[in-house]
């Protein structure tokens, strides 16, 4: 006869028992098969600094949108953070360029007209789990990191994925 060992006292209970017959511990869910992956979620509790995020590319709100797109292309980056007096006021991503600019006659104009205003932000002391949650809930691929309202980095879905792959070995 097969049974389930209580994780608290080690007593062998009948399969399907919800409570240990020996110590009364809750057994619900302990007989669920575990995932065969070696990933155990350890990275979810890590702070964003573990991602090794580089300094962000920053442009002033009055910068020309075409110049910003050119910088993004030349540097091989997906977004720029937009500031006024050093404080984050928006983000402009490759998606913004494709959706708001591509195929439309865009004269030179300020990036502030096309950026996403007041983006969702993170702090360095927040965890990777918080970043993943904000990305999933908001449908974002880029979230600025700020310190006292000033941008210090950008977390990207690519950063999180790369870190996940590295942690799996």
Language-model-derived ranges and their functions:
Residues 1-169:
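Tandem CBS (Cystathionine beta-synthase) repeat/Bateman regulatory domains
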């Amino acid at each position: 006869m097969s049974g389930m060992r209580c994780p608290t006292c080690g007593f062998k209970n009948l399969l399907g028992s919800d409570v240990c017959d020996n110590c009364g511990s809750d057994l619900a869910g302990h007989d669920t098969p575990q995932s065969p992956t070696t990933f155990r979620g350890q990275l979810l509790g890590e702070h964003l600094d573990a991602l090794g995020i580089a300094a962000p590319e920053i442009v002033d709100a009055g910068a020309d949108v075409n110049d910003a797109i050119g910088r993004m292309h030349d540097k091989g980056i997906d977004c720029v953070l937009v500031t006024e007096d050093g404080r984050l006021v928006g983000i402009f991503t490759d998606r913004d360029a494709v959706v708001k600019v591509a195929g439309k006659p865009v004269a030179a104009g300020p990036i502030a007209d096309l950026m996403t205003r007041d983006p969702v932000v993170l702090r360095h002391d927040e965890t990777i789990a918080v970043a993943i949650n904000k990305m999933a809930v908001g449908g974002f691929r880029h979230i600025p990191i700020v310190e006292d309202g000033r941008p210090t980095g950008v977390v990207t879905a690519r950063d999180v994925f790369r870190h996940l792959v590295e942690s799996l070995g």
